[in-house]
Curated annotation (Swiss-Prot):
GO terms for molecular function: electron transporter, transferring electrons within cytochrome b6/f complex of photosystem II activity. The lineage of its organism: Eukaryota, Viridiplantae, Streptophyta, Embryophyta, Tracheophyta. The keyword Transit peptide does not apply. Pfam families: PetL. GO terms for cellular component: chloroplast thylakoid membrane; cytochrome b6f complex. This is Cytochrome b6-f complex subunit 6. PANTHER family: CYTOCHROME B6-F COMPLEX SUBUNIT 6. The chain crosses the membrane at residues 4-24. It is found in: Plastid, Chloroplast thylakoid membrane. It comes from Magnolia stellata (Star magnolia). The gene is petL.
Length: 31
């Protein structure tokens, strides 16, 4: 259970960071 929870937490963090980077890149391109 612990490994599954940590895996999902890592996956969620990776998705959040990726989406934040994509939004930042799109904003920079719009400027």
């Amino acid at each position: 259970m612990l490994t599954i929870t940590s895996y999902f937490g890592f996956l969620l963090a990776a998705l959040t960071i990726t989406s934040a980077l994509l939004i930042g890149l799109s904003k920079i391109r719009l400027i």
